[in-house]
């Protein structure tokens, strides 16, 4: 039995690629995210035929009191419909406490991880932040049901599947995984389209009150570069820009770009250091 835990649509695509590459059967999948997001439902439907059991659960609510105990209780609740024992558990977010709690309420023989977009190769990402926990705190958390922390996962990780095998990764035990077969893409024409990939703008800057200023700069960039298409981030649908075609689709950027390539278009990609660009 195999369990995949995903938190983004890109992770669902990678999970699907791993299942197909390794020819896995008896797969369960847990998706932690927004049930009201159409993209989540779309990509869950793509992977469902490869799985025995799939569920979509909301992320645990943030709280400052008894958070370890509350996460443990929540992990037990969402895992009630799953097996108690798995041969291998696959996931990307090895730094997320809820993942640690889920691992603590089941048993497994092996852990394998895969990329969370570019976070694994971006040394400024949250994955690279020091999260060492005092021994006394670990003991207390263990009493509350949390057996694992980030450093434990990194030690237990058997294999890491990556989209960027040639780049340094926070996890060294790498194995390449491919989402797109470029040989099947049309060779292209002389027509070039410019695409801007959006981001979560409140996450892109330190000072949250300057978001509107950043939005204005993005609009100026669109005008100056004569951008043809704007693809918003799945978690940032609040902003629409002028003088550009805003693409509102259930597909994620990687799939939208692939469709353009299949049409034979040449593309110039602009953005905020996203997986689709790399």
Which residues does each PLM region occupy?
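Short, hydrophobic beta-strand segments that form beta-sheet elements in well-ordered domains
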Residues: 4, 28-31, 88-92, 111-113, ...
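A donor-sugar binding/catalytic signature common to diverse glycosyltransferases
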Residues: 4, 15, 254-278
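Well-ordered, non-membrane alpha-helical segments in soluble/globular domains
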Residues: 16, 68-77, 98-100, 208-222, ...
């Amino acid at each position: 039995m195999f369990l995949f835990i995903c938190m983004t649509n890109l992770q669902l695509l990678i999970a699907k690629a791993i299942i197909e590459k390794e020819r896995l059967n008896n797969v369960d999948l847990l998706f932690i995210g927004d049930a009201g997001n159409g993209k989540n439902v779309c990509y869950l439907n793509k992977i469902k035929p490869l799985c025995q059991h799939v569920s979509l659960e909301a992320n645990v609510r943030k709280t400052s009191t008894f958070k370890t105990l509350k996460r443990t209780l929540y992990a037990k609740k969402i895992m009630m419909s799953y097996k108690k024992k798995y041969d291998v558990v696959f996931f990307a977010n090895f730094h997320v406490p809820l993942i640690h709690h889920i691992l603590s309420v089941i048993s497994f023989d092996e852990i394998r991880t895969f990329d969370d977009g570019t976070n694994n190769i971006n040394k400024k990402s949250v994955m690279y932040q020091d999260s060492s926990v005092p021994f006394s705190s670990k003991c207390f958390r263990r009493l509350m049901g949390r057996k694992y922390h980030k450093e434990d996962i990194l030690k237990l990780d058997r294999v890491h599947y990556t989209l960027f095998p040639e780049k340094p990764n926070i996890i060294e035990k790498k194995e390449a995984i491919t989402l797109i077969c470029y040989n099947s893409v049309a060779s292209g024409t002389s027509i070039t389209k410019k695409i801007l990939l959006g981001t979560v703008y409140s996450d892109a800057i330190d000072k949250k009150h300057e978001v509107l200023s950043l939005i204005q700069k993005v609009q100026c960039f669109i005008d100056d570069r004569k951008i043809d298409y704007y693809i918003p981030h799945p978690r940032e649908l609040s902003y629409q820009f002028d003088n550009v075609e805003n693409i509102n689709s259930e597909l994620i950027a990687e799939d939208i770009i692939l469709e353009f390539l299949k049409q034979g278009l040449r593309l110039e990609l602009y953005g905020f250091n996203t997986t689709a660009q790399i």
